[in-house]
Amino acid sequence: MKVIIATDGSSFSLAAAQEACRLFGRMKETEFTIVAVFEDVPIAATEPFALPPEYYQEMTDAARNQAQHNADQTAEALGSGCPDANVAIEVLSGKPASQIVDLAERIGAQTIVVGSHGRGFWGRLLGSVSNSVVNHAPCSVLVVRSEPAGEE
């Protein structure tokens, strides 16, 4: 079974990884893919407000590094509960929901596991990554609701 765990580095994502471990970790054939997606910093080219190109590259590099850190942290959390898990990491650039869905199609995932921030009415109105993944995924999606300490 191929399971994608999407992470943004939040405690909600870590809770999703723990739930994925609990549900799928005992199956020897489970292949976990942890995905973290970062968005490139858009270039503002209007003078006199334009910044040097190096600034945008530095910001994109910082976003990529943070996404890698988030994925590594999630892999560590998954490994603590499922020490024998087969885990791969993908760090992708683009819109998070579409990259997660594209990855699921590309690897033939059977399940995507995402955390939910539970933003209530306004969050639902404005949309969210988990909502978009649920509506566009080619496979089952498990949305893990939790209220970790210190976050609401």
Predicted regions mapped to residue ranges:
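Structural beta-alpha unit
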Residues: 22, 76-112, 148-152
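A short acidic, glycine-rich active-site loop
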Residues: 53-69
